[in-house]
Amino acid sequence: MSVIKMADLDLAGKRLFIRADLNVPVKDGKVTSDARIRATIPTLKLALQKGAKVMVTSHLGRPTEGVFEEANSLQPVVDYLNASDLGVPVRLVRDYLDGVEVAENEIVVLENVRINKGEKKNDPELAKKYAALCDVFVMDAFGTAHRAEGSTYGVAEYAPVACAGPLLAAELDALGKALKEPQRPMLAIVGGSKVSTKLTVLDSLSKIADQLIVGGGIANTFIAAEGHPVGKSLYEADLIPEAKRLAAATNIPVPVDVRVGTEFSEIAPATEKAVSEVQADESIFDIGDKSAEELANIIKSAKTILWNGPVGVFEFPNFRKGTEVISNAIAEATANGAFSIAGGGDTLAAIDLFGIADKISYISTGGGAFLEFVEGKVLPAVEILEKRANG
C-alpha cells in the first residue's frame, strides 16, 4: 500500500493540517475516555520535533452543520492536551476557514470540522479552504477513513502534499499483517448484537480465517440455527439460513453452556446452564465456563488473532466472565508469540476493563473503518492518499 508517510517528510517550517480522530466522550466539560487523544499525541510530538507549524482538527459528536454548540466543541480536548506532556501551548481557533496564523512551538486545534457547512458531503469549496491552510495535509484518523468527507478526502485532493500520519500508517501495516499474510492458524473473533450488521465481515473472514468464533447476539443466532431454544434472547430468526451456511463453510464452535438472566439489568442474577436448557422467559447474556474454557484453548493455539466484539454483556459484572476469559487467553497467546489485533468500541472498552492494553499486539482505533477494511472494501481516505502518492 504505497502512500507518502509523514515520518519520511522534511517538515521544517511547513504548515501541517492534521486530521486526527479526537472524537472522545465528554461529560461536564471533561474527557471521560482519553484513548484516542493518547494515540494522537505521538503524531503531534513528531510534527513538533520536525519543526512544523502544527494545526490539528477532528470531529466530535454529531453537531448540525453551520451551528456551533458548546457541547460539540473540542475545548475539552484542548484542555486535556494543555495538561499533557506536549510541552507547548495548545489553543483553540473557532473561525479558521479564511486563514489562521500558526507559530512553531505551539499547536492550534481547529474547531470541530462537522460544524463546517459541506463537511459531510465533501463540498469541494470547503475542501479547498482546508487545503489553503496548509503545505502538507496529514490524514491520521483511521476511524473516519471509510468516509469521503471534506476533512478526510476532499482536502487530500487539493493540498500541496497529502500523506498518512504515523497512526494511520501503523493501522494499515497491522491490518495488512493480519489479513494479507497471516501466520497460521488464523482465528477471528466476532461479537456484537446482530449478524445482519456483521454478515459481510463474517463472510470475508470465513474465507481468510482457519477458525471463527462468534459471540454476543450473533452467537445466539448460531445457537438457534443448531436447533437450541434461545428464550427471549436477542437473535435474528430470518438469518438462521445464513448462520447455517457460514457454519458449514468454516469451523464455528457453538457454546455448550451459557449464562442467562430474566431481565437486562446490572443486578439481574446469572444462572449457568447447558445451552439446550434455556427457558422461554430467559435471555442468554454470556457464555458458560465450559464454553469459555473451550474457546480459550482454541485462542491459545492460534498464531494470528483478529478480535472484534465481546462474547457477552461484559458491562454487567454477572455476565462478564466469558469476555474476561477470552481477553486473558488472547493476552496469553500474544505473550507466546501470536500476533493479535483488536478493534471496535466495545472491544476497546473490554481491553480497558481487563487491563490488557499492553498485552495485545495492535489495538485499532477504528470501528466502522476497521470492519470495512476487514470486509475488503476500499477506504476512500486511503485511496486518495494512494492516488496522490502515485501521481
Swiss-Prot record:
GO BP annotation list: gluconeogenesis; glycolytic process
Keyword GTP-binding among UniProt keywords: no
Which top EC class is given?
transferase
Which EC number applies?
A: 2.7.2.3
The pathway is:
Carbohydrate degradation; glycolysis; pyruvate from D-glyceraldehyde 3-phosphate: step 2/5
Q: What keyword terms does UniProt attach to this protein?
A: ATP-binding, Cytoplasm, Glycolysis, Kinase, Nucleotide-binding, Transferase
UniProt GO cellular component terms? cytosol
Residues noted as binding ATP in the record, renumbered to the chain: 198, 315, 344-347
Q: Read off the InterPro entries from this record.
A: Phosphoglycerate_kinase (IPR001576), Phosphoglycerate_kinase_N (IPR015824), Phosphoglycerate_kinase_sf (IPR036043)
Q: What is its main location?
A: cytoplasm
Q: Name one Pfam family in it.
A: PGK
Q: Annotated Gene Ontology MF terms? A: ADP binding; ATP binding; phosphoglycerate kinase activity
Which residues are listed for substrate binding in this entry? 21-23, 36, 59-62, 114, 147
Per its UniProt record, what SUPFAM superfamilies does this chain match?
A: Phosphoglycerate kinase
> Which family is annotated?
Belongs to the phosphoglycerate kinase family.
The protein's assembly and partners? Monomer.
Q: What is the official name of this protein in its record?
A: Phosphoglycerate kinase
Q: Which organism is it from?
A: Actinobacillus pleuropneumoniae serotype 5b (strain L20)
Upper lineage: Bacteria, Pseudomonadati, Pseudomonadota, Gammaproteobacteria, Pasteurellales
